[in-house]
Structure formats: structure tokens, C-alpha cells
Amino acid sequence: MDAPEEPQPPVVYTMENKPIVTCAGDQNLFTSIYPTLSQQLPREPMEWRRSYGRAPKMIHLESNFVQFKEELLPKEGNKALLTFPFLHIYWTECCDTEVYKATVKDDLTKWQNVLKAHSSVDWLIVVVENDAKKKNKTNILPRTSIVDKIRNDFCNKQSDRCVVLSDPLKDSSRTQESWNAFLTKLRTLLLMSFTKNLGKFEDDMRTLREKRTEPGWSFCEYFMVQEELAFVFEMLQQFEDALVQYDELDALFSQYVVNFGAGDGANWLTFFCQPVKSWNGLVLRKPIDMEKRELIQKQEATLLDLRSYLFSRQCTLLLFLQRPWEVAQRALELLHSCVQELKLLEVSVPPGALDCWVFLSCLEVLQRIEGCCDRAQIDSNIAHMVGLWSYAMEKLKSLGYLCGLVSEKGPNSEDLNRTVDLLAGLGAERPETANTAQSPYKKLQEALSSVEAFEKHYLDLSHATIEMYTSIGRIRSAKLVGKDLAEFYMRKRSPQKAEMYLQGALKNYLAEGWALPVTHTRKQLAECQKHLGQMENYLQTSSLLASDHHLTEEERKYFCQEILSFASQQEDNPGHKVVLPMQFARLKDLHFDPPNAVVHAGGVLTVEITVCSQMPIPVHVDQIAVNVHFSIEKNNYRKTAEWLTKHKTSNGIITFPAEASLFPASQNSLPALELSEMLERSPSDNSLNTTGIICRNVHMLLRRQESGSSLEPPSGLALEDGAHVLRCSSVTLQPGANKIAFKTQAKEPGTYTLRQLRASVGPVWFVLAHIHPIVQYDVYSQEPQLHVEPLADSLLAGIPQKVKFTVTTGHYTVKNGDSLQLSNVEAMLILCQAENRAVVYSNSREECSTALLRIQSSDKVTSIGLPTAPAYHVIEFELEVLSLPSAPASGGDTSVPGTPELHRKQKDSQRAGHCMVTTDHKVSIDCPWSIYSTVIALTFSVPFRTEHSLLSAGTRKYVQVCVQNLSELDFELSDSNLEDKGHATDLRLAPLNTQSQQLIHSKQSVFFVWELTWTQEPPPPLHCQFSVGFSPASEEQLTVSLKPYTYEFQVENFFTLYSVRAEILPASGAEYCKTGSLCSLEVSITRLADLLDVDKDEALVESEDYFSTKLMYEVVDNSSNWAVCGKSCGVIAMPLAAQATHRVHMEVMPLFAGYLPLPDVRLFKYLPHHSAHASQLDADSWIENDSLSVDKHLDDQLDCSSLRSRGSTHSTSSSEHKGLPMPRLQALPAGQVFNSSTGMQVLVIPSQDDHVLEVSVT
């Protein structure tokens, strides 16, 4: 302890540094225990809980145990943590009280006094118990007495600062327990010391950083302080925390540089603005670059020195963290930021010095990463390293240009001097790389030594970079490097090698739509093609560049003149043609005349195109031609003027899509920009520092567009040969839009498709291989046609109607004297008027001429003279035709409309008959251009529908005629008349209509009534003809007299034979009928005439005194107001004598209160079947069964439900008579039965005991 003080060696800052623990007391004892202690201490981890809420960590503690010396204790103001002893241990194995008092106690007292003098409170006393010594000394006190004395003398309130280690060199459980307790205590005290001292150090460091705005603050001094903290974390193997310290220093220095660029510079930054004199690159092969650290400590480091040292420390820690790819990423950012920081600080850098530093640094980082990773790891992480390869290649290229190693003649003396100066700035090679054959230093020195060496190194770097970019899918970057390589080959006069790279880059830029790179690459490619003598390719590229608006006007004119000069030089060799794509001009639109692009054979068609020239100067074109492909359409109908007119564009203008981009990656296919505002404010006063716009989907916008097809125009262009070509010679194309017109005379019918547009300038032909969209014009040859159609929707019979005649001449020329011969139809007249005119139209519907029609009519033929007209014209004229009106004769007699069923039948038939009756007239027309007749059919609709009915009032009879107007016109009816065509003298028709003229509107009806009287009984049948004059109500006076409308019908057996009367009487003693009470129904059937011829049928029965006939009556109540009780029908024998009456009595019950209409009483003729079986049966039995048959002439609406309902209860009887001949019911003719009770009503009052009152209102 009292040995003479030895000079302490300087602290070596290496990765082997460990926390210092001093050892005082028995050094021999510690030496014997040290191997076990150093091995056991880091074995178990301890949880380190740090201040400021930082997450706890598990650490393995190691220590550097050194002999205690007072010089090791830190002095006031010393901030070095690496030399700071974190714990002091005193070792003793004293077991004798006398020895303790004589020596140990005094030594402990001196030791503690020294610690107290330096304010060190982290100490520990270790008493080692040894059983061997205990056996040798029998009179010693127990061990505990020595420990107790030490604790009483030195520990006072800190008894845990004295620990016992029992037999540390033995292998026993007791020894192991003692070691575990000791090691736990030692680790705990060490962690407590770390936490306390590091916390104090961080507070002091934070206080120093907060003084950075004071004038005397030094970044280098602060750098050393925070790096001391990083060293401690590294010493504790907390590499992440150590890296954070360097990152904070990096960010702090970068912010000061940015502020300096903005005009807010710190005074200490001037130390880093000194000129750069050394550019030997990064040093990454040793943990700490002490030379640069000393320069920083002395404030003599340049910006490159500081950045190099700072990155070397970050690199070391990242490699310990096994994150080598982050080293590459950070290195690339560092190199770029250093270049910018040198510009911001305006540091003087010799030309090429920074390129050397970047090149050496890139290779140093790459070799450092390759040294700690295997080949598989490197291959899978090329994406992180390729940026450094590319940057190194770029800087080597800059050095080559700077030192004249790329020029054709090689470096000159000035270039050599510059090379010597650059190599001198590299200094001597570092010892750690002196024995490495491919060290960055040697590579740079070799590359700058000769032209051949530079080319070798540059090509190696370029090819390696291209291969790496391609392998990771960064095709754009690979093509960009390829462009640089092409530029290098062009300088080396090797254009054949450069072309491949330029073509690849151009294809990529075209695929993705990068306009400016396309222009720049094409310029390089044009130069390359010119050197190679590829004249066709050069002219093609020149035409693209001449029309490229990204170039200046002078550049565009130069390339345009190149094309014109070549064309003028080749005029001596007219047979040689150079075919190029038409890139300098764009087809804008095309206009046809006629507009529908349809012309007849022999007609003239004009095609006018608009060509936009993108040349900067007017270009004289020898010839512009359009190659036309001819095809014959098999479908002849497609060639008719009608079809072509309907299916062609009306304006005749076809617009071609603007080729806004030759690139498939058009703006329409890209997603919309997602822009957001970015504001950065100062944390101190919230003032706005920077503002900008961020694109959040830039990864989508800049994504590569794969393209499998070539985007350059196809090289195999050829001029199409054909017989059909539209030409226009000697045209000067001005910059912008130029209109060029082609005229052609159509000869052969078919479809002509415009295929290829070409322009010639001397032997140079510019070709637009395909015109898209498809452009066609049609030439047709049409047969003459005649088309007849009404002007209205439908032709009405009976009034003059206009018909339009359309003659399409087709290829036929109508000569003077040609006429249409119409065969006359008996029921249709052709009205001739003096003012009839024919109009001749051209094929484009332009009126050519008008002429009066020459119409000559005879009994059989009407001749219409046609005006002269050339081929493919249209003749139109109108004629009036008149179809004679008629109505179909009625089929026979109508029923007497006395019952509701008959009214319903009439209404239903009216609903079904709202369509007009039509009449077809076929007219045969002979045309001058054909030997065959043309037959046309004209359909006329009869505007009226007529119905008749017989009305009865007792024995008086009336005939009613209903005329319904089904057309859309209003008519005026006049002179209605009804006459007997049989001319019977004993019949007379007396009209009851007072008006001579009546207006009938559309969809309305007019009724006419006549009273029918006769003098002979019975009257004969009536055969009538109704006629009425009509004319359109809206027309003026017609020039032709119209025939009246006629309608014929016949009425037979219209006289009254039977009169039926029904009467309902209340119950006996009651004044009114009541609901629910039986009432008496009296039906009387009266014969009004004696035996007539109409009665002589199967129902006639002859007796001794008179004739009779069998009738069946039926009482029916369709309105369900009455309930018939008992039988509702029966068969009676009616005497055939005038005034013979048959009465029937039955009971009915009213179901509702109110005025109720009487039930209907119906009469039928009952016709028995004359057979043996039938004569043996009673008539009533026939009525009762369910097998009554009704004559097929019976009215459809006859309701026999009562019969069926009664018969359903006698199904057994019905089955018994199955197969027997059945009687028949026959309806009486219309008008023979008159029901005088029709329309009568009976008052029914409600019963007094009804709880619910139901009243029927009719």
C-alpha cells in the first residue's frame, strides 16, 4: 500500500475497458481469489433500473480489479468515467484479535479516511474465513468476534458493507452459499454505484448542453463529455444506449450546420471551416481512431475528421448490434450530407479531394461489411450496398474526367499535376490495410495511375453496379448507370458499345413515360448512330428530336436540317428509298365530302385531312399520298343508299386521338396525387420554420410500368403498293395544322379503307403505317327503286288521302317520256290535280329541279310522266287517292235489347271492336327501267263502325243505328237515311232525327232512330240499307264529291207475340212487403196473336178445340234481392189465341229493404224430343232432372244457374236417365216477347225485429 508511486500509463480507449474496482488490504489473498471472482461475477445477469422512467435492462457485470491507490480517486472537475473507480473493496483474512488491533484496524482506518477525503462512499469490506488457519491457532477468538469488531468500528449503520467469504477456495455447499451471497452483494453495490454516478454524470452533461447558447461554449468539449457516457454504456455492453449518444451528437452538429447555412452560425463552427488538406477516407478497421479523437479534443479537427470519427464509432456499435446493413445505409446518407455540409460551411476543398474521400469511404464501408458477413448474407442484402457501389462509381468517373483519364489524348501535364496533388492528400496508407492487396487506398492509387487502369476499375465498378441494380429489380437505376457507361464509351470513341446501353435506357424511359430522359437519351443515341453510320436510324431519331418540344429551337432546327440535307444529297440516287415512321407529323382529323362518306359509282369524293407538323421550320414535301385498300362487300344490302345513309356519320368528320404521349404509362392510368401540407414549427416560440408539400403515394406514382413490347416504332416499315392511291403533290407543311385535300372519282362499287399515309422528301419516305381508327368510304351501284308510302300514319277510306312516291334512279337515267303506268282499281280512285309537282334531289338530298306532273288517266291505266333525272338521284311527288267507303252487311237479326245481359253483350263487343276495319288495294305499276311490274299494297281503314238494334214499346217497334268514329279526325255527318231495300208496301220507316247535320268527334258515337210501322199482320221481314253523308270537319271545301257511307242489315220476326207482366203483392193483411216475409209473385203471360206461321214447329200441339205451344218460364234474380221459394221455372201449354193468358203464382222473400227491382221473367220455347221413351215421360220430370239441353242458338248470356242448382239435388235421377233423348230450350226471336214489368220497383220495409238494417238502393 505504501509502495512508491509508479507513473500511471494513459488510458487506452479500447473495447476491453471494464468498470474499475480497487482492491486494498491483503493483496496476496485477493490474488488467490481473483480467478474465481472474475469467472463468477459476470455469470448471472442483474436487473438494472435506471432513472427518468427508462426501461430496466438485464446486464452481465464485469470489472477491472486494480490495486487501490489514492491517485485513482477522481479529483474535482474530472468527468472521465472510464478511469472512475465505481467500488472500493478491502480484503482481509485476519482471525487474530491482536493482529487486528496491531495492523488491520489501522490500515482500514487509513483506507476509509482516504475515501472520505475524496467523498467516495462506495466501498465494501470482505473478511475471508479460512478453516486451515483456524485449526493452527487455538487461542484465537471466534470469527464472528473479528467481524463484529469491524462492523462496530467501521460500518456503524451500514453493517451490510461488511461481508464474510468462507473458504473461497474449497468445493463445498457452504463455500458455494458464501460465494453466492458475496457475488450478489458485489453486483448490487456495483449497480448502485453505476446508477448514482451515471445519473450525476448525465445531469452534468445535460447542464453543459443547455449552455450551448453561451458565447464560450465548445462543441468539442461537449463531444468529449457525451462520448464518455457512450464509452461507459459500451463498457457495460449496452451498445444501443451508446449508439444513441453518438446519434444525438450527430443530430446536434447537423442542426448547427443547417443553422449556419441559414445565417445563424455558432463561433465554434469556425474551427471546422478550415480548408481540407487530407482526404484519406473513413477509418473503420479499429474500434477507436485515436488520432482523429485527439484532433477533436484539441479543436483542430476538420469537418471530414469529425464526421469520419463519429461515423467510425457508430459503425463499430452497429456491428456489435449485428446491423451491418444499417451501416451501409448510414454511410450513404453521411457521404451525401458531408458534401452538402462542406458547401454550407463554405469550406475550401481542392478539386477532386472530396471525390477521393467519398470513393475511399464507400470502398472502406463495403469492405468492412464484407469482412463481417458471409457471401449468402451479402447476396441477400445487395439492396443496402448497391448505393455505395453506385456512388463510388460516380466519384471515380468524376476523378477520371478531372484527371484527363477519359479524354482521347490522355492526361496532359496539368492533369498529371492534379493527380499528384490528389494522391498526396491521401497520405501514407494506414498500417491496418498495408498488407491488403485490394484496399481502397491501393485501388484509388492504381486507378489514377494510368488510363488503362482507370478504365479497368471504372468498367468493373459499372458492370458490378448494373448487375446489382438488375438483380434487385431497380431497372431505372441500372439504365441510368448504363447511360453513364454509354457516355464513357462515346468519349472513348466506342459508339458500338454505347448503343446497347442507350437503347436499353430509351426503351425503359419510353415504357414509363419519362419525357425529359427520353429526349436526353435520344440526343445521345443520335450522336452514337451518326458515328456508326446508321443513317436510317439516325434520320428516324432526328425526326423525333426535331419535333420534340423539350429541346431548344436551335437544336430542333439542327436535326430538321440534318434530314433535309440528307434528302438533298441523295437526289442523285433516285432508286434508293429510305422509309421512316412518320413521327414529325400527326394526323389530327379527316373530313369527307359528301359527309356520309358514301358516293355512287362515277361520283366524286373529296377527302380532306388535317396534318399537324411538329417541325420547327416549313418542310417542302414532294408528295403526300394515302394508300387505299379496296374490298367488295358480299352483302348487297349494305351497298344500298338507304343503309349507307343510316349507318354513316352525318358530319363526315373523323377525329383521331391526340398522341399526347407515346408512352403507355399515360396520366390516366396513374393514381391521383395524395398531397398533404407539411408545417414545421420551432419548439420554443412555435414560429413557422419550414413549410412544404408531401406526396403520400409517391411509391405508387413512381412504380415501374412493365412493358413486354417494344415501344420504338417498328423498323420493318414498307411502302404498300396498290392500284388505289390518293395523291397530292408539292405540299409545304408549315409548323402547326395543315389542310390537304384529295379528290377521287369512284369507279368500282365496294368499300375503300384508308390504310397508309406517307410523305416523301426526296428519297426519304415518312410513313404512318396504320390509320386508326379505321377510316372507310363506300361506293355503291344501286338498282332503280320505287317506294310508295302514305304521308299519314294510316290511310282513311272515303276521303282523299296523300301518298308519297319516291323514285330512286340508281344507275338508271330517267329520260324524257319515261312514265309510271298504274293499273286502276275499281274501289280506289287516283285524283288528278293540276298543281301536282315532282321534285328531283341529288344523292346528298340537295334539291336539283322541280317539274309539273303529267298525269293521264283512262279506264284501266293511269300514266304518270316522270321528269328527267340523272343517275343516282331521287324523284319525289305526291298524289291523292280515294278509297270508296263501305261497311260489312249485318249477318242477320239482332236480339231485342230489353235485358241487362244484352246491354252487357253490346258493351263487350264495342270494347273488342275499337280497331278499324281495313281494306287492302293492290296496285300494279309498270316502271320504265324494268320489264316486270311492281305491285304495291295500300291499306285503307274504315273510320266508322256501325251497329243496329231493335227497340220495343209494347207492340210498337223502333230501329236504332249507332255510328262510332274510330279515327283521330272529326267528321260532319249529313243526310242520314234508312230505306227498305225490299220495297214492301205495308212497311213504313218514320225518322225520329230532327237534325240534318251532326258533328261526330274522334272516338265518339252518334245514334239514329226510326219508328217501324206496318199494315199487314204479321209484317214481312225488313231488309234495310243505312246511308249517311260525311266529310272531314276541319277540311275546306273538297274538290271532289264524296260518296255516302252505307250499312246494310236485316230484321225478321220483329212483331210482339207475348206480353209478360209480373207483380209482387205483400202478405195477406200487410200494407207493404217486409224483409224476411214471404210475398206473392204473380206472373201473367199473354198471347197477342192467333196461330201464325212462326208457331208451326215442334212445340205446336193440336187439340180438338185449339192449338197450343209449350213454353218454359224462368224467374231469375241476378241482383240477389229476392229469394224464390219453391220452383222458379216450369213448362206451360200456351193456347195460340189472341189475349190468351196464363198466370203463374209463386212465393218470393225480399232479402233487403228499399225499392227493389222485380225479378226477371224469361220465356223459352220448349221443344220435346219425339220418341217412344220421351212420350211416356211427364214434362215436369224433364224439368226436374239435370240433363236439359239448350239450343245452340240460345243467347250466350242466358243464366241457367237456377236450373243447375235444382238439378244438382237429383244427381241420382240424372244418372238413371242417362242416355235418354233430352228436351231442348229455344230462345224466342228478338222482339217477340215484351216484358211490361221491366224497370218496375217494389217498396220493401225492414222487419221490426231486425237488429241489423240492410237497405238496397237501386
UniProtKB/Swiss-Prot annotation:
Biased composition (Low complexity): 1201-1214
GO cellular component term, pick one: TRAPPII protein complex
Keywords noted in UniProt: ER-Golgi transport, Golgi apparatus, Phosphoprotein, Transport
Null allele phenotype: Gene-null mice have smaller total brain area compared to wild-type animals, with specific reductions in the size of the corpus callosum, regions of the hippocampus, anterior commissure, and internal capsule. Only white matter structures are affected in mutant mice. There is a loss of myelination in these regions, but oligodendrocyte numbers are normal.
Region annotation Disordered: where it falls in the sequence: 888-913, 1201-1222
Superkingdom of source: Eukaryota
Compositionally biased intervals (Basic and acidic residues): 901-911
Gene Ontology biological-process entries: endoplasmic reticulum to Golgi vesicle-mediated transport; intra-Golgi vesicle-mediated transport; vesicle coating; vesicle tethering
Cell location: Golgi apparatus, cis-Golgi network
InterPro entries: Ig_TRAPPC10 (IPR056917), TRAPP_II_complex_TRAPPC10_C (IPR022233), TRAPPC10/Trs130 (IPR045126), TRAPPC10/Trs130_N (IPR056913)
Pfam family, one: TRAPPC10_1st
Residues recorded as bearing Phosphoserine in the entry: S707
Family, similarity comment: Belongs to the TRAPPC10 family.
Record function comment: Specific subunit of the TRAPP (transport protein particle) II complex, a highly conserved vesicle tethering complex that functions in late Golgi trafficking as a membrane tether.
Quaternary structure note: Specific component of the multisubunit TRAPP II complex, which includes at least TRAPPC1, TRAPPC2, TRAPPC3, TRAPPC4, TRAPPC5, TRAPPC6A/B, TRAPPC9, TRAPPC10 and TRAPPC14. TRAPPC9, TRAPPC10 and TRAPPC14 are specific subunits of the TRAPP II complex. Interacts with TRAPPC14.
Protein name per Swiss-Prot or TrEMBL: Trafficking protein particle complex subunit 10
Organism: Mus musculus (Mouse)
Lineage: Eukaryota, Metazoa, Chordata, Craniata, Vertebrata
